[in-house]
């Protein structure tokens, strides 16, 4: 097949993929609302997935490195802005996986949101969310990338705050916007620097133009942008708060759209940072701190969605560690495998929540394996894949990252933190299995338990297959074809498995202690630190906002009221005149002797003046 034929095939298939996605949104403005519209959206995404398989499989089989399509858009002075689409292994594989996962999530959402009167608008938002992520992934210039970047940001705000009648949902949506705005500053700073110094936003050109430049400033901006969007430590609180949105939103947000956008940005622009040791070290340490801190927070949470949400943040930290190791392909492999089991974990959580009358507290569950066998089996598979159990999807990416950091001569502290976080992953994953699936039911007796609906079963089963075989398939194509290093000792090779087994033993011990504890509410500082998210929200959201409010109150009451209105104002003037007034008030007391004395004194003074003159 010639290059021109390949070009036409790629252009046709990918244009058709995007057109199929855009058509339902376009027709929604023309036609009247229909109960069938959610099914039409689901079928459109399903069809797009099968169409996108053609160029993806072709790209992987022919081992094509990159394929770029240019369209002239507009020009400002000497700067030309093109619609430039880049199709390489990263964009092709990610598009296919995102469409597959979104197809499953939309099918589940038809069941989950069937009672919502605005379900058509909900599906429109989800589809727009997906399209914005597609724009970001395929962009070959910074302006297009910024459009997709802001698109996923605004759609996350609308979807997290979907139940806008709830104060917590509104607060979570605002948190997502505000924290991501901090990250957006970094991306805009990078774009400004690149335009000033290279006069171009074309990504492929930028790599050559910046080769001999000091790229510390734009690389710092990229790291800040990824920190905000991918919820790294410092800008992470919005991610667990985003659990206030509907479960399908959480599944899409955490698997293949919003949160991986920051990591994907660093993967796409990795040549800008690959030779900057300071930025790589910062990314490595930031990722290690994030993965440990969020895994620690997940240990003592009782909301099933919060636990899965914190696990996402922990895995994003692991991806950032891979970026810091100069291994973007490992970070991308983990993005792809993570999408399957994370979406499945959220769908299983949604199925359980609906079956238990919207109950999310794992302490009030139990015995679900008897009443929801399919959901329980898939939840177990997803949890095992998240732990990195051998031969499931998560093993191939997670184990590769831990092997890479084990064999590198980089920061040993980052290695220790990552290994501890890996152990904690096993702890909270098995904690979910223990509390939700095992022992006797702790639920209300009248719970509408039912998973016989194909809208529940089919999406979860599809994602379960992905969680089992995706890692084995993807690692054949994503990992570089080079001679494997055969010098690792068995201990180094088995490190990830060993720490996961330690986590298993720890989880069993904690579960045993939970059944024997005397106090209902643990009072240890370590428990409170984990359960209250390291006190970070209390410090940043309360203390940091309370301090300026108190300062404003003090300046208003003490500085303005007391100083200007009292000390220096009317009361101050009155006080300075008080001493003089007290002295001269004796003259006006109405005593005759006082008046005679004043008169005699006046006569004497006048006489003396006359005699002198």
Swiss-Prot record:
Its EC number is 7.1.1.2. It comes from the Eukaryota. It is an enzyme of class 7 (translocase). One of its GO terms (molecular function) is NADH dehydrogenase (ubiquinone) activity. It holds the Pfam family Proton_antipo_N. The chain crosses the membrane at residues 10-30, 49-69, 92-112, 117-137, 145-165, 176-196, 247-267, 279-299, 307-327, 330-350, 376-396, 410-430, 455-475, 494-514, 592-612. Its main location: mitochondrion. It is found in: Mitochondrion inner membrane. The keyword Membrane applies. GO terms for cellular component: mitochondrial inner membrane. Keywords: Electron transport, Membrane, Mitochondrion, Mitochondrion inner membrane, NAD, Respiratory chain, Translocase, Transmembrane, Transmembrane helix, Transport, Ubiquinone. InterPro entries: NADH_DH_su5_C (IPR010934), NADHpl_OxRdtase_5_subgr (IPR018393), ND/Mrp_TM (IPR001750), NU5C-like (IPR003945), Proton_antipo_N (IPR001516). Coiled coil: none annotated. One of its GO terms (biological process) is ATP synthesis coupled electron transport. It catalyses: a ubiquinone + NADH + 5 H(+)(in) = a ubiquinol + NAD(+) + 4 H(+)(out). The keyword Zinc-finger does not apply. It is a multi-pass membrane protein. Core subunit of the mitochondrial membrane respiratory chain NADH dehydrogenase (Complex I) that is believed to belong to the minimal assembly required for catalysis. Complex I functions in the transfer of electrons from NADH to the respiratory chain. The immediate electron acceptor for the enzyme is believed to be ubiquinone. Belongs to the complex I subunit 5 family. This is NADH-ubiquinone oxidoreductase chain 5. It comes from Polypterus ornatipinnis.
